Amino acid sequence: MSKYFRDFHLMRLLKGFSTQGLPLDLFIRNYIKANKSIGSHDRRFLAETIYTIFRWLGLIDYLCGKKHSWEERYEIFKTLDTTTAHKNPALPPHVAVSFPKGLYDLIKSGLGEAKTKEFCLISNTQAPTTLRINPLKTDRQSLMNLWEGTYEVRACTQSPLGIIFKKRENFFGMDEFKQGLFEMQDEGSQLVAFLVDAQPGQQVLDFCSGSGGKTLAFAQRLDSTGQIYLHDIRPHSLVEAKKRLKRAGIQNAQILQYDDKKKKTLKNTMDWVLVDAPCTGSGTLRRNPDMKWRFDPQTIVKIQEEQRVIFAEALEFVKPGGKIVYATCSILPHENTDQMTHFLHNHSIKLVGSPLEISPTIDGMDGFFGAVFEKDTNMA
């Protein structure tokens, strides 16, 4: 594709995204599907360029002055050296790292100035491309041997099931994916899922399951015994979860709709409950740079309250002596350690071990938090 047509599609993507409400990754995917003449090399160029523009949009707009047309933004972007631009002492701190001031100040209130700058800068880089192998169907070394010479891969250092690709590929088109040998999942997300240390024969409830990513990660621990329930308020997510469970060969799991009458019979019966709570998603901004421009920091109190309500509701399903895992993909103490303290003060539970805190600045993974609690044996 010529430079003219690449720039043509780039402008169509940027302008089109600005007028709709889809997440950036889904919008790009839909556009590519509708424009099949765009080759793989140009698809990669368009995606990487758009993601980089959105990562640095705050600084780009600052340098643009009053005009903010996409054409002008793109011209500024092409002259921007992102490795040095943030070092300009004349720039306001939030502009230098290309974050909205409200979100920057919110992060700073929890992490302090130095850690906030470090976090914001790494959030403006590309996240690693990580997958998790399905041990019900294969093992990590077998897949790495299979891909040797075709792709550049390496094993994750902390997740025994993780593999990191040097470059993004058409993973969903691979036979290995269609056969259920792997799923895309950040290494940090895998580690959070492994906090659910379920044993064969136990009962597990994934209370905010979404499309089932974390269930797919811990399901193998039950050795195809016991029962896993996937619950979510979003029916379309559960439809996708059902497809993924089938592809992975997981047969001891069932979908639990939000209004399912069976829910009442499950209270006080679960050995494990996972609460992957709705959150700001601040730990995943490398993958979702558009989110930071949509986030209203004034909503943090509402988010905290929602997390507390969900945790209290989920706790009702844990049997006395059972365990509940609270997890977020956030790096904000407001959603993590502050909530952990609130739960301990307001429920008959105790903390099991130390919480898991993952930051892109330390571990290179996405930012996650996870804490395991045990329900009082006298509660019912």
Which residues fall in each region the model found?
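S-adenosylmethionine
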Residues: 1-380
